[in-house]
Amino acid sequence: MAAMTVQLDIVSAEGGIYSGRVSHLQVTGSEGELGIMHGHAPLISKIKPGMARVTKQDGSEEVFYLSGGILEVQPASTSILADVVLRADDIDEKAAIEAKNRAEAHMVDAGSDFDYQAALIEIAKATAQLRVLETIKKNIAR
């Protein structure tokens, strides 16, 4: 019996990042974690900054960082339209730590015209990148 898979396309403003058959997709939607497999009900959801874990048709996994976007699930395909997509190997850990620290420092020293929402978004994005890297490191250690 053939594995039950779904076509997944991950696209950013810069172009296509991933296209292929997958047996499972895990992503963080606006209402929490979503697991998408063959036969999932149609769905449209906002995506929070975080990780997309893709289990390919051959059983191997690939992990991506998504800065946010939209997930669309249809009977024959699933699409992620993301603001920014990075393969886990392309995440700069040092830059993510610096961005998080910089945003946190700005919040402490903020004046009345400071944009707290923008700082919180930057912290969330940097933290999500660091979580993706942490997940990859844990998987390698196994």
Swiss-Prot record:
The keyword Metal-binding does not apply. It is a peripheral membrane protein. Pfam families: ATP-synt_DE, ATP-synt_DE_N. The keyword Nucleotide-binding does not apply. It is found in: Cell inner membrane. Keywords: ATP synthesis, Cell inner membrane, Cell membrane, CF(1), Hydrogen ion transport, Ion transport, Membrane, Transport. HAMAP family: ATP_synth_epsil_bac. Produces ATP from ADP in the presence of a proton gradient across the membrane. F-type ATPases have 2 components, CF(1) - the catalytic core - and CF(0) - the membrane proton channel. CF(1) has five subunits: alpha(3), beta(3), gamma(1), delta(1), epsilon(1). CF(0) has three main subunits: a, b and c. Belongs to the ATPase epsilon chain family. This is ATP synthase epsilon chain. It comes from Shewanella denitrificans (strain OS217 / ATCC BAA-1090 / DSM 15013). The lineage of its organism: Bacteria, Pseudomonadati, Pseudomonadota, Gammaproteobacteria, Alteromonadales.
